Amino acid sequence: MKILRTPDSRFANLPDYNFDPHYLMVDDSEDSELRVHYLDEGPRDADPVLLLHGEPSWCYLYRKMIPILTAAGHRVIAPDLPGFGRSDKPASRTDYTYQRHVNWMQSVLDQLDLNNITLFCQDWGGLIGLRLVAENPDRFARVAAGNTMLPTGDHDLGEGFRKWQQFSQEIPQFHVGGTIKSGTVTKLSQAVIDAYNAPFPDESYKEGARQFPLLVPSTPDDPASENNRAAWIELSKWTKPFITLFSDSDPVTAGGDRIMQKIIPGTKGQAHTTIANGGHFLQEDQGEKVAKLLVQFIHDNPR
């Protein structure tokens, strides 16, 4: 497996991003290893809040949320998925599979020995994170889902997703910062857009971002469909606290919150919130609001 590593210089002087990098190695399934970057903020002896990003962002997306969570006394773990952020980037599209992404994040949980986790997941962070919850129920204490889903391919994903999937494959240059900009309702500065572009010096670094839309199960016989169906069976028995924090202006995942509230027992009685003035990347549009809701959710649902 050929692996690319973004130079550290690309991450210098990013706006509102003053966090120390941490790294661990995960098996790449081909007799070598990938370096995974993660943030580890707040007291090490506190129960962890795990923040999982999605396509095509990285943990920079959580820069507004982390200070609020740590100020409330929480430890925050925010990894970059392989192919994104400061994590290594396999150079071939075929290096990326749904199962490998799950395995890579499973390795992060295992190596850091995370328990009593509160998960916040958005976009692909949910496709991966909800699998982790279903497969490691004893590690997780609470779940907060925002603008995400866990598709099995048994239901149509909608016109919004199909348009995004087609766009991601046909555009000659995949402009990551522009994609983030188009998924927000607030105006992003050029410096913030550049920060989202920072992990990708050129198109060769973007194979993971290009491949992600094709890995979403969209047919019943998708390679990930069976495992996702199994995950839903487990989630249908999940009685620990589960809250939905979706935004009001995301055409891709709209309605996913109602599905979760219908199926997952742990959603009963929770203060589910539709966050106003938030696009798909609600952490960018309303990060402070999301973080405060997450702090309240943890407070209202002690172990």
Curated annotation (Swiss-Prot):
Domain AB hydrolase-1: 48-192
Pfam families xref list: Abhydrolase_1
PANTHER family according to UniProt: AB HYDROLASE-1 DOMAIN-CONTAINING PROTEIN, HYDROLASE-RELATED
Superkingdom of source: Bacteria
EC supergroup of this enzyme: hydrolase
Subunit note: Monomer.
Protein name: Haloalkane dehalogenase
InterPro entries: AB_hydrolase_1, AB_hydrolase_fold, Epox_hydrolase-like, Haloalkane_dehalogenase, Haloalkane_dehalogenase_1
